[in-house]
Amino acid sequence: MSRGIIIIGSGFAARQLVKNIRKQDAHVPLTLIAADSMDEYNKPDLSHVISQSQRADDLTRQLAGEFAEQFNLRLFPHTWVADIDADAHVVKSQDKQWQYDKLVLATGAAAFVPPIAGRELMLTLNSQQEYRACETQLRDAQRVLIVGGGLIGSELAMDFCRAGKTVTLMDNAASLLASLMPPEVSSRLQHHLTDMGVHLLLKSQLQKLEKTEAGIRATLVSQHSIEVDAVIAATGLRPETALARRAGVAVNRGVCVDSYLQTSHPDIYAIGDCAEINGQVLPFLQPIQLSAMYLAKNLLGGNAPLKLPAMLVKVKTPELPLHLAGETQRSDLSWQITAESDGMIAKGMSGEGQLRAFVVSEDRMKEAFALLKTLSV
């Protein structure tokens, strides 16, 4: 490969891919292009920065230059890719262009901000860069509204509460983690957050935000309003697909790829939060790690289809941590729940009596790996 491999992006997926490629080939030309600084940080740490009094710069693990030297790369930080000419195998920015043999899109996903009046007052915490932009406001804020009671919203609510802030957590659904599990399973976390002092506004929808002398007024569709100092959008992520569209490759929710992580164009691949693998968007660390292993082989001439085993998803709420696996969101499962003072085991059983999903908490999390082995997938 005389022109080599270009990777657009510098997050976890891009870095895992680089490491896996270099394990197999020390010399193939590798180029990374990204809009950020390309310094490495651990994104899950963003769920705990406030209680741990961390500044954005404290999250940096490795500078971009060190990474480039360690893995023999060409890096182009702070560079916006404007277009991809898939037929000519060329990536273009405003003032540069690069030729490639193979191209990998690792463009990640952007935080979704609800399209309401005053949406510009909402903050997002989806990157080190976003946290850097609002860290002073968040540290100084005493009253915080978090919009979205999913994985990230629940983690942030606990973290801000542990930091001594007055926290309101709002969601359209009737329970927390509603897209991941039924209310009878998430209720343990819900009760714990309430006991900590988090004010839950469930079955509630935000209508508008307005700047006031005292801070920000958040008005609900019900016309109930609350005064806060900061509002965080934790309403999910949207895969970044704009570049893929410009390149002419197939896009659905994410960039559509097959089991080989290949898009509809034979020399363009996608990995990480931007990828939709056989119809599934999997923005979790373990599938990204496995994707990087398989994609590295395939970029270097292999032909190995990605096989994803049953995997754990971790909810990083330190005072009541949860692990879950399987089809926890299925509505036709019968849940067997054992809840004791040291934790909970919830098993989602099919009509045929097969274990199709489970959620474990606290000290019962040590049973997760044994349950994984018996999970029907």
Curated annotation (Swiss-Prot):
EC number(s) from the headed UniProt entry: 1.18.1.-
Any matching Pfam family: Rbx_binding
Principal location listed in the UniProt entry: cytoplasm
Molecular-function annotations in GO: oxidoreductase activity, acting on iron-sulfur proteins as donors, NAD or NADP as acceptor
Subcellular localization, as worded in the UniProt entry: Cytoplasm
Pathway: Nitrogen metabolism; nitric oxide reduction
HAMAP family linked: NorW
Protein name: Nitric oxide reductase FlRd-NAD(+) reductase
